[in-house]
Amino acid sequence: MKHLLAFTIVLNALLTWQNSQAAEPTHHEADVCVYGGTASGVMAALAAEKEGAKVILIEPSRWLGGMTGGGINHLDWGKGNTVSGSTYKILMEGLEVKEQKHHGGNAILGIGNKQYRERFKKAVEDRGITVIHEHRLGKVQVGDATIDEPTRQQPIAMGEDIAPKGKAPSIRSIILDYAPFDKTGCPIPEPKKRNAITVSAKVFIDCSYEGDVLAMSGASYTWGRESREHYKESLAGVRPNLWLHDIDPYVEPGNPESGVLPFVQDRKIGPLGSADDLTMGYCFRYVFDGSGKGIPIPEPTDYDPAEFEVYRRAIRDGVDIFSNRHMRTSLKKFTVHKKKRRVPPMLYRCG
């Protein structure tokens, strides 16, 4: 009798779990779908909801806020006088902050990433906006076509920025794959479930850093920096370097014939104000807080000391590459060429 009772309880629990799984909606409809829970994505969702729209916000990671919620805050939005309106309300309202001189301006040093994420989450929850986490773009349905690969466009530096003629078909829906991040907080190579959720909407806003919805939509787009003349903007195009250090870039110091060190770009930067085809090197970084509660750091299976040679030379030459606490406790990189397929664990753009 006891065994029968135990079996019945287990069976009921299993059926309840299966029913809850089956009850999860696989199709959502909204007036506005915002893809990318970055800071701009959250603000776009809030603005649309304020206008009376039914909004769905999709964020492939576990939390909202993008770089503001998980980046190096003082670099992402360090100058307090640049934050205002609704954004200020979320990020700064009710805080006692202090300012210090940073990069020639006043940097706001307030709360950390976790608190910012909580503020973004609360702002969305207070407005009743549906948020879907841990699902990333798989396909885009445009008109009668289903697109699963980005369309290629010409960068500004290589061609004119010309939109296609005529009325292009609109996005009907996007299809999401279930792809939770791994234990280190990074995206997994292959999703656990493809075609998990479909979201239909009248308007789609791509607020992700990657721009995958845009790339699969068939809309015209470009990348890189426009020239100063393109839109008559005095600060556009190639700008002067902020930091210059005389570090030998060659595998064999002083010998150009030996080639350049890993991840050093052997290319000339154009004249000031000119266009280029470079993009920001968005990446995932590891943060060390010194608490001893983090996960162990295993030795990489493909570790190559040469990838860190530029650091060794910089340190030997007296370059202070860890001049502030953010640099001391994280691994990060800056700029990457569009053709790069792999980035180093951490890299300063030298030369």
Q: Could you say what each language-model-derived stretch is?
A:
Residues 20-22:
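Boundary at the C-terminal end of the N-terminal hydrophobic targeting segment
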Residues 47, 53-54, 58-170, 201, ...:
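Conserved N-terminal/central alpha/beta ligand/cofactor-binding core
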Residues 41:
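N-terminal Rossmann-fold NAD(P) dinucleotide-binding loop
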Residues 26-38:
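Beta1/beta-strand and adjacent pyrophosphate-binding region of the FAD-binding site
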Residues 152, 157-203, 207-351:
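Flavin (FAD/FMN)-binding glycine-rich loop and adjacent Rossmann-like elements that form
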Residues 35-38, 58-61, 67, 71, ...:
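Active-site-proximal beta-strand/loop segments in catalytic clefts of secreted hydrolases
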Residues 6-16:
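Bacterial N-terminal signal peptides
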